[in-house]
Amino acid sequence: MFSPPHRLSLPVPATVPHANQQFPRFTEGFLMQELLEYAASSQDEVCALIIDDTRLYPCRNVHPDPAHHFRISDADWLAAEEEGEVTAVFHSHPQPVPVLSGADRTMQVMTGLPWWLACNGELRKFRPVPHLLGRRFEHGVTDCYTLFRDAYHLCGIDLPDFARTGGWWLRGENLYLKNLTANGFHQVSASEAVPGDVIIRQPFPGADPCHAMILLDDNMVLHHDHAGHLSRREPFRMAYMKQTHSIWRHHRCSSLDLRGISADISARSH
């Protein structure tokens, strides 16, 4: 978990490299291995900055509770910037929580950088997507599929983007049903639906189904429609049930960690 300092700051081991020390450039596979070994070197959260996408710049974790949080000092951040462009923030979670915390997401959005997380011997790279709640609708940019894709990304499953122009649901393009099938989803019945499943709605009679919602706990849904609303979480009400065309589940649903969504929502709610 990231704890915001007075400026932006992150964590380093007891021995920290000096700013004038040369850092080797790594291939992607070697860099990933170095990051995982670095994470395994401590029972506390470790952190680093990635320089030019190729170099690891370890930072000291100066947070008073390093077992659960991390903080990078101004001095380490500034020293890293002297080495090159900071292109990502790296840290570890010693606890088995392989998604960004609410505090992590708050600071990731502020930095606008990819955040890389080591947990359970694996490395995940998170894009700096906007918070899930409160987005303004722009078709093809921040629309219902963008929200669906970004939410799944924060939960550990990456989906491709696809080109779409307004009114596709009136031209027989049927983008949702075609792309869901092509990207590892299969239909389930309403009685089988569980949190994390994707509800596809058909709001316009005679048109293709064109709206996606993610089912959450307590019969809530996360979605972003074109009715002038911001992206939001709300009850799965009767009107939505009547418009439901189908419900879909990803074949890697066991890897979908919904704590990624709840952490982001908690960050946005504070």
Write out the residue ranges for each language-model feature.
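Conserved beta-strand-loop surface patch within small alpha/beta domains used
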Residues: 1-88, 94-127
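Active-site nucleophilic cysteine motif
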Residues: 138-155
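Extended, compositionally biased flexible segments
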Residues: 81-94, 223-224, 230-231, 235-246
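Second-shell loop/turn segments in exported
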Residues: 132-138
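Glycine- and charge-enriched low-complexity intrinsically disordered segments
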Residues: 234-270
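Short acidic alpha-helical/loop segments enriched in Asp/Glu that coordinate divalent cations
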Residues: 158-168
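...with weaker cross-activation on analogous glycine-rich loops/strands in unrelated enzymes
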Residues: 166-231, 236
